[in-house]
């Protein structure tokens, strides 16, 4: 993905995370799969961008387990940091 599409994906992901009232593996997976479809990205591209933004790595334990363990506040902080790096 290029810089613009990565920025858009992460910005939409940040909005999504902010809107979630439940932050568990199943809710996260369902929400992010729907987001990928809505913004026209493959799950591979979206999930890869989120993984790198949140963990700094290309390979991690299962993404949604990782997000749930990190928690909403930490995930939001890391997404915002990644967005700042892209601007």
What are these regions (language model features)?
Residues 1-87:
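Conserved nucleotide- and phosphate/pyrophosphate-binding catalytic cores
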